[in-house]
């Protein structure tokens, strides 16, 4: 499935006139395969062995291109660091308050929330974001030992 998503994402970039460099391909592939919502620094550290001449700025520039193409969402939280999420479908995030781990989940009951909000408020709704905060299973196990 990830190979298909990567191929589609590369096609999207090509259609918008973006040149596919080896670094760009690797960064996108990392995002498609990552469920960890990495920071730019995480991506840089994961790929620096394969691309020793690549800088963190290169990663940020590519993430900006991906975001502008609609392939990646930038998730900002209160700690001033951005995390990046490859956009496959609408989903929400459960975030561990101890370790910062982010887990995706989907709740079909919220699919109509934008229409309801638009109806109730008169807003022209563009999107929404839901975050649930708590303690992940791994951190809970550590606390109980």
From Swiss-Prot:
GO terms for molecular function: DNA-binding transcription activator activity; DNA-binding transcription factor activity; DNA-binding transcription repressor activity; transcription cis-regulatory region binding; zinc ion binding. GO terms for cellular component: cytoplasm; protein-DNA complex. Binds 1 Mn(2+) or Fe(2+) ion per subunit. Zn(2+) binds at residues 96, 99, 136, 139. Changing residue 136 to S: No repressor activity. It comes from the Bacteria. It holds the Pfam family FUR. Its cofactor is Mn(2+); Fe(2+); Zn(2+). Disulfide bonds: none annotated. Its main location: cytoplasm. Keywords: Cytoplasm, Disulfide bond, DNA-binding, Manganese, Metal-binding, Oxidation, Repressor, Transcription, Transcription regulation, Zinc. GO terms for biological process: negative regulation of DNA-templated transcription; regulation of secondary metabolite biosynthetic process. Changing residue 139 to S: No repressor activity. Residues 1-78 are annotated as: DNA-binding. CDD domains: Fur_like (cd07153). Possibly oxidized on a cysteine residue; the Cys-SOH formed in response to oxidative signaling may rapidly react with a Cys-SH to form a disulfide bond, leading to the loss of metal ion and inactivation of repressor function. Oxidized PerR can be further reduced by thiol reductants and repressor activity restored. It is found in: Cytoplasm. Changing residue 139 to D: Full repressor activity, but no modulation by peroxide. InterPro entries: FUR, Fur_C, WH-like_DNA-bd_sf, WH_DNA-bd_sf. Hydrogen and organic peroxide sensor. Represses the expression of a regulon of peroxide-inducible genes such as katA, ahpC, ahpF, the heme biosynthesis operon (hemAXCDBL), fur, perR, zosA and mrgA. Homodimer. Belongs to the Fur family. This is Peroxide operon regulator. The gene is perR.
């Amino acid at each position: 499935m990830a190979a298909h998503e990567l191929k589609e994402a590369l096609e999207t970039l090509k259609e918008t006139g973006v040149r596919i460099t080896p670094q760009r391909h690797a960064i996108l592939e990392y995002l498609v395969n990552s469920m960890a919502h990495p920071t730019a620094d995480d991506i840089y550290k994961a790929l620096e062995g394969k691309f020793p001449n690549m800088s963190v700025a290169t990663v940020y520039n590519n993430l900006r291109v991906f975001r502008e193409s609609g392939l990646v969402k930038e998730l900002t939280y209160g700690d001033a660091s951005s995390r990046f999420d490859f956009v496959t479908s609408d989903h929400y995030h459960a975030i561990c308050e101890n370790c910062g781990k982010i887990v995706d989940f989907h709740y079909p009951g919220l699919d109509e929330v934008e229409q309801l909000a638009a109806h109730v408020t008169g807003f022209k709704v563009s999107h929404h974001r839901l975050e649930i905060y708590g303690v992940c299973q791994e951190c809970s196990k550590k606390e109980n030992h």
